[in-house]
């Protein structure tokens, strides 16, 4: 089987567009169409449904996608082993949660790009462990970074490379800030027994699937008394804007509100236990030398508190 057809297949599956796949592969769109038809004829199955919105994998196509990626991984490994003395080069795609993409990775990727000029590094938003699993399995990303307490997915290898501090924050003029009579030490963590006194407050949390927001929401809803009012958003910016306007409280990574705390637009009410930063890779997929190098650099940057960026 011509592996070029498999590469076209996986690229079209990832982009969902004949035009985008052709551009990425530096082929004419008609060539992509011909190659996909040739592969479908060879396998005697339909791999894609051609819809006005683009190319969508059929159930059979989705089932064969991971197998095709394994074949291409084996081809890449063969080429690498034939040129073991070659410099580290290639493309690495990092999947990461929103807060890491916005506040940790930009400077880190800039530093990596300076240190590894022959490696092209891309970032892609990944919202949950299940999404990370799908993207790692399909080859859309090579490595994922998530803020999660744990990830129990058998085909994913996980390691803790750092921790992200969390804080409960509010606007300076919020009634609960003004009601605080005992100043808190910066390192003092919340006593979960105190959550009952928060029940009458309004909270803005990140959408379901965010582990620390989910845990906090469960704790709030489990406390006696009136259930709190909880609104969930898919964006840290939306949460922060509502809190800055004095509409309620939020639990967020400290790094995402550091500038607001420094300028006194927000106040820290309680510190919470840190959430681990997990690095994930697919156990059965080949990890290129470029990806291995990027992973090693990310471990070091996280251990240094990201100051290396």
Would you name each region that the model predicts?
Residues 10-28:
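Short helix-boundary/capping micro-motifs
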Residues 40-57:
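A short LG(V/I)-centered, amphipathic sequence patch enriched
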Residues 42-43, 64-86, 298:
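Alpha-helical linker/hinge and terminal dimerization helices associated
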Residues 89-152:
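Central regulatory/effector-binding core of bacterial HTH transcription factors
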Residues 127-132, 140-141, 147, 209-266:
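Hydrophobic hinge/microswitch elements
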Residues 147, 176-178, 184-223, 287-291, ...:
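Secondary-structure junction motif
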Residues 153-159, 164, 237-286:
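Beta-alpha-beta core module
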Residues 269-309:
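A late-sequence structural motif
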């Amino acid at each position: 089987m011509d592996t070029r057809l498999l590469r076209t297949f996986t690229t079209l599956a990832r982009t969902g567009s004949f035009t985008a796949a052709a551009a990425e592969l530096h082929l004419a769109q008609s060539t992509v169409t011909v190659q996909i038809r040739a592969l479908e004829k060879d396998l005697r199955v339909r791999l894609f449904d051609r819809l006005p919105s683009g190319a969508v994998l059929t159930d059979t196509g989705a089932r064969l996608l991971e197998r095709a990626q394994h074949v291409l991984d084996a081809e890449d490994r063969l080429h690498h082993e034939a040129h073991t003395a070659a410099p580290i080069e290639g493309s690495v795609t990092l999947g990461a949660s929103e807060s890491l993409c916005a506040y940790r990775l930009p400077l880190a990727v800039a530093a990596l790009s300076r240190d590894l000029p022959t490696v092209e590094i891309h970032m892609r938003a990944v919202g949950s462990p299940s999404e990370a699993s799908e993207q790692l399995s399909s080859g859309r990303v090579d490595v994922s970074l998530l803020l999660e307490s744990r990830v129990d997915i058998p085909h994913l290898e996980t390691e803790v490379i750092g921790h992200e501090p969390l804080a409960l924050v509010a606007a300076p003029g919020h009634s609960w800030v003004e009601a605080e009579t005992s100043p808190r030490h910066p390192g003092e963590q919340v006593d979960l027994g105190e959550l009952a006194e928060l029940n009458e407050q309004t909270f803005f949390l990140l959408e379901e699937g965010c582990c620390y927001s989910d845990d906090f929401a469960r704790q709030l809803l489990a406390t006696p008394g009136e259930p709190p009012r909880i609104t969930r958003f898919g964006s840290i910016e939306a949460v922060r804007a509502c809190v800055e306007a004095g509409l309620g409280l939020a639990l967020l990574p400290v790094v995402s509100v550091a500038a607001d705390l420094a300028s006194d637009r927000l106040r820290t009410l309680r510190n919470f236990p840190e959430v681990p930063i997990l690095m994930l890779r697919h156990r059965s997929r080949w990890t290129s030398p470029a990806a291995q190098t990027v992973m090693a650099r990310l471990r070091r940057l996280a251990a240094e508190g990201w100051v290396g960026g």
